């Protein structure tokens, strides 16, 4: 069983870097870097953990649900993967094209961050929706490995063991996505001071990334959706980079897992330390206000006696 969990964990780590949906990672990173909020680093890292966890929930949850459905007999879902990938690409392409004109469509699936202060960081709901789209685009490339893991789990384990396999698969995806999220947040905090001039162009930069991402996904999935083979050759640029990333992750699975755990614990400790310092900072001015006032009172100059007061005796009569 331990070997099966390790296999599921490794498969989950490889899932986010598949060639079918790998182009969505730059869009997500661009959205995270687009947040120009000048918050302290612990706050930014905490937000990155939340967005990465939400993205993992949408991504791994969608793939796990699809795996359960297909393992139950609904194998027609895998045949719809090319259409899902094509639809995701067209949606991103249209959204980016509209944003290039200067407009911001009010859709439920917000894949961008506005440069306005009121927009704030991406919400967990938006990141989870992004993860669902990421999984839909990655369905065909990642489903073979997931089904192989599910088949072994069904043959060797109970239903509780099957749930443990899915949990290990989700943990593997979380290890990669959380590291990407935290690294992006840390880089964003450092880069914000250097590339502030690009902030006013953030929406158009994000739109350009969405257009390129959508165009790639549509180009990749159109032949498969219409009955042909995918046009992305194994030696293509993005496919080659994805294969290189996959090979590197396979060779460093344990190191990535340990690093992810250390990073999550470090960010959690930094967030707790930041929260414990905030009440002390807010209580300092109120606690020192009375002493400051007392210092002002004790050091206030004495009233200067007037001539009228010096010309009167103790009975109040004039001398």
UniProtKB/Swiss-Prot annotation:
The keyword Iron-sulfur does not apply. Keywords: Mercuric resistance, Mercury, Metal-binding. The keyword Cytoplasm does not apply. Hg(2+) binds at residues 298-299, 318-319. One of its GO terms (molecular function) is metal ion binding. InterPro entries: Cytochrome_c-biogenesis_DsbD. One of its GO terms (biological process) is response to mercury ion. It comes from the Bacteria. This is Mercury resistance probable Hg transport protein. It comes from Streptomyces lividans. The lineage of its organism: Bacteria, Bacillati, Actinomycetota, Actinomycetes, Kitasatosporales.
